[in-house]
């Protein structure tokens, strides 16, 4: 799927009703297991982060087992848990603590190993979408793109989120697209 096709698909999906949504879920289930830019292991670890955030014990068990089967290391599993810790500590609303939280996140997320930072941002984007937290979505989308995650890789995260969270994810697709448009506009103007 090309970026334009994915973008069009996501725009349409945000306006669908229940039957269309169920049809999409069937397609997404198949799509999420296909080979793409993200490895199967990355997808499992991101999905594990979502399962932990949602506190779904059955999902945690399934995705922990699958990530381990795909040779995820204890270090990688630890990164998922640390991202979850940070995401759960996010200030709510218009808190004065937001800027301090962002600085703490950036200190944690920074790594000399670029792939670690990319991975942390991808897990954070997925959780931000489930949280329906616009500031988080914008922050993690911008950070991910800045460290080399492609928009296509980010679009591969959306089906995982939809499979774990269902219909509420649809309300965040316009937010994700708006943040991406803002990011590209800012890059073009700088």
What spans do the regions from the language model cover?
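Acidic, glycine/proline-rich low-complexity segments that act as flexible tails and inter-domain linkers
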Residues: 1-44, 48, 55, 64-118, ...
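Short N-proximal segments of mature Sec-exported proteins
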Residues: 44-54, 120-135, 158-164
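Membrane-interface alpha-helices at helix entry/exit sites of multi-pass transporters
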Residues: 77-80, 153-157
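Long amphipathic alpha-helical coiled-coil segments
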Residues: 147-151
């Amino acid at each position: 799927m090309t970026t334009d096709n994915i973008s069009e698909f996501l725009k349409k999906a945000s306006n669908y009703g229940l039957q269309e949504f169920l049809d999409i879920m069937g397609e997404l289930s198949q799509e999420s297991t296909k080979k793409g830019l993200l490895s199967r292991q990355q997808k499992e670890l991101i999905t594990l982060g979502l399962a932990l955030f949602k506190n779904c014990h059955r999902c945690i068990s399934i995705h922990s087992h699958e990530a381990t089967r795909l040779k995820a290391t204890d270090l990688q599993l630890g990164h998922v848990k640390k991202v979850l810790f940070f995401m759960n500590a996010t200030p709510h609303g218009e808190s004065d603590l937001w800027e301090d939280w962002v600085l703490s996140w950036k200190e944690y997320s920074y790594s000399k190993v670029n792939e670690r930072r990319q991975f942390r941002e991808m897990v954070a984007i997925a959780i931000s979408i489930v949280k329906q937290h616009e500031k988080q979505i914008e922050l993690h989308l911008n950070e991910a793109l800045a460290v080399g995650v492609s928009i296509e890789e980010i679009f591969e995260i959306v089906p995982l989120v939809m499979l774990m969270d269902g219909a509420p994810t649809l309300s965040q697709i316009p937010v994700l697209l708006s943040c991406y448009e803002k990011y590209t506009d800012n890059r073009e103007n700088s």
